[in-house]
Structures are given as structure tokens and as C-alpha cells.
Amino acid sequence: MLKHVFTKTLIVAAFLMGIAVTSQAAPAQKICPLMIEDEIDEEEFVVYKGIKVYTCCGTCKKLWSQNPDYYAVVSVEQAPQLKAVASKTIKPMAQRFCPVYSDTRVHPKSPSMEYKGKKIYFSKERALTRFKANPTKYEKNLK
């Protein structure tokens, strides 16, 4: 009987320690990892390798699904909970944001075009079309 109570006590203690460690592992996420000027909506999230990653909208959830491994690597600042699961082998591109929607991330599979001898990435086809219509307007956003 005493052994049974002791075992249950150990299980409960281990469970509570696990919760404490998990809750202290990373600061709370406040900013969308893909549209980095927007706050998260707690109803809009994806689960990446068992970790909840909040986004600002359904559009960002769809965007995340296009290249989750890459986005996990470049989004650690906005979503610190990703640090433990983000790839250590994926390297971020030099261009991180769309020149048209300058707060929105791009990835290696994003729509792209050659411009002045350089490959430029866009968050979506509409952004690429806008850039083609007036590239000088968006050149300043090419970082």
C-alpha cells in the first residue's frame, strides 16, 4: 500500500516538474512569425513538431504550410518556442522579406524573378505582378 502511494506521488511530481520546465522553456509568443508587424490571433495556429506556433491569420497558416521547416528556422525571434525544434542545417536566405509586402517573409520556394541580375522572391504572385508593374517603387525594400 505504501509503495503504491509513493509511486503515485512520484508520477504526479514528475508530471508537475515537466509542466514547470515546459512553461519556462520559451517566452510567450506575441508577434506573427510570417507577418512580423502583426500580433498573433490565439485561434490561428499551426502545430510544428509538437509545438504550437501562433499566426495572425488564416493566410499565414497557409503560408507556413508551404515551407514549415524553413519558416521555423527564420522565425525563432518572433516564436521563441521554435528554438528547440528548428533545423540546425537549414540556412536562411539573404532576402528574408517580400519587397512589395515588406513585413511578410519569403522562402526559397516563393514566387521569384530575376531583376538586375539578382533573384528576387515574393510572398505571393500578386506581389510579383505589382513589382513588375513598378519596380522602382519597391526597390528600396530589397535588403
What are the residue ranges of the model-derived segments?
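Bacterial N-terminal signal peptides that target proteins for export
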Residues: 1-11
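Intrinsically disordered, low-complexity terminal tails/loops enriched in metal-binding residues
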Residues: 21-143
